[in-house]
């Protein structure tokens, strides 16, 4: 069963869809947190269907400025995104048949920063799942991504060095608050360079403003305050996220939190989308076959039903 819902975060109206499994409940539930860029509620359709068959309700929503939601995601900080995720948890908690004490956040990519941050802000988050989430800052991740994307594409080392030099120079200007139109004009002068597409932005000042806002976010302090169960999964072949460093930082920070209920998994052969190497001509490999089985099995243990009163 699916129903359209509306909820608010700091005056911005957001629209999404709740999926409920059969039966009266109360059911555990999952709120999905998208990664970077624009995204609508259908981003997690496959995962929501699997969870519904396993007895979980879920909520996916249009990011600000996408689909039926107001606002603009590029105006947000990661703290704003975390507040939005908590508003989604509150929306789920108010749905018929949902157990408000058993709601998890599942964040993918950039959502892997948002989920733990939200959990560090509110006990309403009962568990956190991070899929390909980074344990380093957005700036450090972007340096890693640009370098590894270019090398993976076979770009010459002098071009890789030129790209990284520009990236560092642009970051310095963004940090000190230089005029964004001037920063963008300087960037666009390089748009014919071999390395330019690896910058991965849409060439508008709004995106530069968003990056400047989040560049130096350190996920460790939030992770150090997360005491609910955490599942983090990475792909060994991820060229977007430094997997070894991320897993190490997750483990250290959650250890400092005294969190005894976390599980960290690195899947051999998988990429950032948790897909295996492609076998067909479309260049897109299959999803890890047992990914959602792993997630649902873990969720059942992390969100057990309350014991019947004696």
Can you name each region flagged by the protein language model?
Residues 37-48, 63:
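The serine-hydrolase catalytic nucleophile loop
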Residues 226, 232-234:
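Short beta-strand/loop motif that positions the catalytic acidic residue
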Residues 1-23:
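N-terminal cap/lid segment of alpha/beta-hydrolase-fold proteins
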Residues 91-97, 101-155:
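Primarily recognizes the serine-hydrolase "nucleophile elbow" in alpha/beta-hydrolase
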Residues 76-96:
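Alpha/beta-hydrolase active-site loop
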Residues 131-221:
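Accessory cap/linker subdomain of secreted extracellular hydrolases
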Residues 50-68:
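Conserved alpha/beta-hydrolase
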Residues 270-274, 279-310:
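Catalytic active-site module of serine/aspartate enzymes centered on a nucleophile-bearing elbow/loop
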């Amino acid at each position: 069963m699916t129903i359209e819902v509306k909820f608010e975060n700091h005056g911005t109206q957001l629209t999404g869809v709740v999926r409920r499994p059969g039966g009266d409940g109360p059911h555990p539930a999952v709120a999905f947190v998208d990664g970077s860029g624009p995204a609508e509620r259908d981003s997690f359709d496959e995962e929501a269907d699997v969870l519904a068959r396993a007895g979980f309700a879920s909520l996916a929503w249009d990011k600000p400025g996408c689909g039926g939601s107001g606002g603009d995601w590029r105006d947000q900080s990661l703290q704003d995104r975390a507040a939005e995720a908590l508003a989604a948890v509150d929306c789920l908690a108010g749905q018929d048949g949902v157990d408000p004490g058993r709601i998890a956040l599942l964040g993918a990519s950039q959502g892997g920063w948002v989920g733990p941050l939200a959990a560090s802000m509110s006990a309403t988050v009962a568990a956190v799942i991070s899929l390909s989430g980074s344990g380093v800052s957005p700036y450090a991740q972007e340096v890693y991504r640009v370098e590894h994307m270019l090398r993976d594409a076979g770009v010459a080392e002098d071009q890789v060095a030129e790209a990284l030099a520009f990236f560092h120079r642009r970051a310095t200007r963004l940090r000190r608050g230089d005029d964004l139109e001037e920063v963008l004009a300087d960037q666009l002068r390089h748009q014919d360079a071999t390395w330019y597409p690896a910058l991965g932005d849409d060439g508008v000042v709004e995106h530069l403003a968003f990056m400047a806002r989040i560049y130096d976010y350190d996920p460790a302090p939030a992770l150090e305050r997360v005491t609910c169960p955490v599942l983090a999964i990475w792909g060994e072949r991820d060229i977007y996220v430094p997997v070894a460093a991320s897993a190490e930082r997750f483990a250290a920070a959650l250890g400092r939190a005294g969190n005894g209920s976390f599980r960290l998994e690195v899947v051999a052969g998988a990429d950032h989308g948790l897909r295996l190497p492609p076998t067909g001509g479309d260049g897109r490999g299959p999803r890890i076959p047992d990914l959602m089985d792993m997630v649902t099995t873990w969720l059942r243990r992390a969100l057990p039903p309350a014991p019947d009163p004696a």
